[in-house]
């Protein structure tokens, strides 16, 4: 891995996490919550969104270790009491982030497919397009893990009975430590599951275009 590749990956990561968080804020705004807008988070300004640890250090280290890349940005502030639909509104806000990463991955895959670049390892744009697809799929899958405070837990909360909702609410404080624990203690297993998820989505994309 050279300096140029690191800079390319870092650029893709920053754009991907910013659009992910921006999607949360935009959907919340249209569902009645102006918190993100009033906090100045409905912007493409990276300074407003970047978390040095989760937006830069973790993803770059994972890339350097040839592991599936994932990460995050500063969470967009959301006041669920302002949202239309309450729990279901929160689920829509939550799913907007991973859906954005899915759409970004699909768009770049289709660009690579129809230009033939993604099948030409020697093309100057191959690395860029491949990483756009793989990094966004990694972000999508990671954020769909149903452990608070990840987006998947918000969707699970909306779909669950009161007992599960209570458990998820209690986990909110400790959830981020659970995620870090799983990554640190079961790193190889976690990377394997992430890689399987990314490969499964790539197979799905290939089937979409008849490959």
Identify the residue ranges that each predicted region occupies.
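Hydrophobic transmembrane alpha-helices and their immediate loop junctions
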Residues: 1-211
């Amino acid at each position: 891995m050279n300096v140029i590749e690191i800079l390319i990956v870092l650029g893709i990561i920053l754009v991907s996490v910013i659009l992910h968080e921006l999607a949360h804020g935009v959907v919340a705004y249209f569902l009645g919550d102006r918190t993100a807008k009033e906090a100045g988070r409905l912007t493409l300004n990276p300074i407003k969104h970047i978390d040095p640890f989760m937006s830069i250090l973790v993803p770059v280290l994972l890339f350097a270790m040839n592991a599936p890349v994932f990460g995050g940005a500063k969470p967009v502030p959301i006041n669920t009491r302002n949202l239309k639909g309450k729990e279901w509104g929160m689920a829509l806000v939550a799913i907007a982030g991973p859906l954005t990463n899915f759409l970004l991955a699909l768009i770049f895959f289709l660009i690579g497919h129809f230009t033939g670049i993604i099948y030409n390892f020697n093309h100057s744009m191959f690395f860029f397009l491949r990483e756009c697809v793989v990094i966004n799929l990694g972000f999508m899958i990671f954020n769909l893990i149903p452990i608070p405070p990840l987006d998947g837990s918000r969707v699970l909360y909306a779909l669950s009975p009161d007992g599960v909702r209570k458990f998820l609410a209690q986990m909110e404080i400790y959830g981020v430590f659970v995620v870090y624990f799983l990554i640190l203690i079961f790193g190889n297993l976690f990377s394997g599951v992430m890689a399987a998820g990314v490969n499964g989505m790539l197979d799905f994309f290939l089937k979409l275009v008849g490959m």
